[in-house]
């Protein structure tokens, strides 16, 4: 139902769950809630393209992404409906290794989904300690119709940290393209670009979230057609670029 006030249409059947379930319109949500919504939106976008994907989320709590796990658990039923599985990590390294393994799903037979997406999350110190997994994951490459976001929680003002943090150098060193959303709208929009960048390049996409964005609330416009991504017409060695995986991470196979 709608009513008209000062020439504007007012939605009267509002639900707190609209921030996750509304397909088209305006929603209000926090930065952490936007990360949850991003998982759902990416799955919906893949279904529109005829791709049935599953998603694995793992990592370790730590501000400013410390409440992501709570929000994932609270919305388990909704996540299950969108093929999203959450397995918290004992630490950041094990969470990253779990996501690393998810990208090998296409290497085995009888797979359940057309592709597996991943989302790793951790505070800046977790980015530091998980660098070895990040590098190995990027040498392997993401799976077909897959893609991974490495959500790095930075606390530059030390709101709840002993030291200020800036994760870009570590993410760059791990060969990741980096996205840095400045509000909840950009989490939803740039998140879609980040997944497509990962899928196209074969690399994990770094996704930097600072305290003010994670803890803050804002409004965002949602629409299945809002983000229209054009895949580059890029050739490599005279052939159209297509990412392929390489699991031979030993000896001369890892050298140029």
What is the predicted role of each segment?
Residues 63-199, 210:
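Thiamine diphosphate
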Residues 4-38, 42-45, 181-256:
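Flexible, low-complexity linker and terminal segments
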Residues 7-101, 125-128, 219, 254:
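Metallocofactor- and cofactor-centric catalytic cores in central/energy metabolism, strongly enriched
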